[in-house]
């Protein structure tokens, strides 16, 4: 194949992957909108961050809203079409700003944000989540819209924190928050409040997967900023974000945080940890991203193919393990049925 044609094919594949990343990370855009619609409940620790931010790590803008789309920011890090990328970012920011302004004017959306924070606080305090208490939070003028407001709060809880708001009984007077993730909790985390924090795991794993199975620290912080989580600033759910992603999730073996090989000055990247590989799969993460976008995994062709290969490799490993177990069990049964013989010794 002529060299020029190969270059065109490589460029086309690169653009296709960038489009997949953009589509896959719309979930970050949505979570950013949710964050901006409701009042902030994350107390700032002070003007001086508690930890020194690494070079190149995005910081919270002063007097401006946080970045409203991670999709453009992340995809642009790999694009060599700088001018086009900048235009896409500006267009995305303009659209997001318009969307945010509209949502702030929507009192039902505002009430849903207030209710979501109320439900999270109830859970954190280990207090029952009662319908009567939720009605007290909703402004008197909008009580007739309570069902719509509750549905909005439930969607936010699912999208941002991976939580499902379930009715405890048919009467619908009490509710419980249940994790939608398959990730387990073996007791190493400090308490049950950690499972909503783990709702960030699927989006984080998704970012890493879409970025080629490793994401730079800068890329991860762009994503965190979209969620309203900033380096050195306490967050209602995640606590101190740097500690959460570089220590807590690393110690739990969900993430690996390591220096980029041969980087000088040193730069760092995030990868899936062994526990993430054990408790979820690339296909499940892709299904999560697709669901958040109203799409299917097949809408991400290259990543779908990679996820399929991962599923096949896992199936082969499981098959090999089962075969070894069958062989071991057969050998054990054969030995147990063999007659016991005792050597005879002359007197």
Swiss-Prot record:
Pfam families: MAGE, MAGE_N. Residues 328-347 have a biased composition (Low complexity). Residues 108-307 form the MAGE domain. One of its GO terms (biological process) is negative regulation of transcription by RNA polymerase II. InterPro entries: MAGE, MAGE_N, MAGE_WH1, MAGE_WH2, MHD_dom. Expressed only in testis. Residues 1-104, 315-347 are annotated as: Disordered. GO terms for cellular component: nucleus. PANTHER family: MELANOMA-ASSOCIATED ANTIGEN B1, MELANOMA-ASSOCIATED ANTIGEN MAGE ANTIGEN. This is Melanoma-associated antigen B1. It comes from Homo sapiens.
């Amino acid at each position: 194949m002529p060299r020029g044609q190969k270059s065109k094919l490589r460029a086309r594949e690169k653009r296709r992957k960038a489009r997949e990343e953009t589509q896959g990370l719309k979930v970050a855009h949505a979570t950013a909108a949710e964050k901006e619609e409701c009042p902030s409940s994350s107390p700032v620790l002070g003007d001086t961050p508690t930890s020194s931010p690494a070079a190149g790590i995005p910081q919270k803008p002063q007097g401006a809203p946080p970045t409203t789309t991670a999709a453009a920011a992340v995809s642009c890090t790999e694009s060599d079409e700088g001018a086009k990328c900048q235009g896409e970012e500006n267009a995305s920011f303009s659209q997001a700003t318009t969307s945010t302004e509209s949502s702030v004017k929507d009192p039902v959306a505002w009430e849903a944000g207030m209710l979501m924070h109320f439900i999270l606080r109830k859970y954190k305090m280990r207090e029952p989540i009662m319908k009567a208490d939720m009605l007290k939070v909703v402004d008197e003028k909008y009580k007739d819209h309570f069902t719509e407001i509750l549905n909005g709060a439930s969607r936010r809880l699912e999208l941002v924190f991976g939580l499902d708001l379930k009715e405890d009984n048919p009467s619908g007077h009490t509710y419980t928050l249940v994790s939608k993730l398959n990730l387990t909790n073996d007791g190493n985390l400090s308490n049950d409040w950690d499972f909503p924090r783990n709702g960030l795991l699927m989006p984080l794993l998704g970012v890493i997967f879409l970025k080629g199975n490793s994401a730079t620290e800068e890329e991860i912080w762009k994503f965190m900023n979209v969620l309203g989580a900033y380096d050195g600033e306490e967050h209602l759910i995640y606590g101190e974000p740097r500690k959460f992603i570089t220590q807590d999730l690393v110690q739990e073996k969900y993430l690996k945080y390591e220096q980029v090989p041969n980087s000088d000055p040193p730069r760092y990247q995030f990868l899936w940890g062994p526990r993430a590989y054990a408790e979820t799969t690339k296909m499940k993460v892709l299904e999560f991203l697709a669901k958040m976008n109203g799409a299917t995994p097949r809408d991400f062709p290259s990543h779908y193919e990679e996820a399929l290969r991962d599923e096949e490799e896992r199936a082969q490993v499981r098959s090999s393990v089962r075969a070894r177990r069958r062989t071991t069990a057969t050998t054990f049964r054969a030995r147990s049925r063999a007659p016991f013989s005792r050597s005879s010794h002359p007197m």
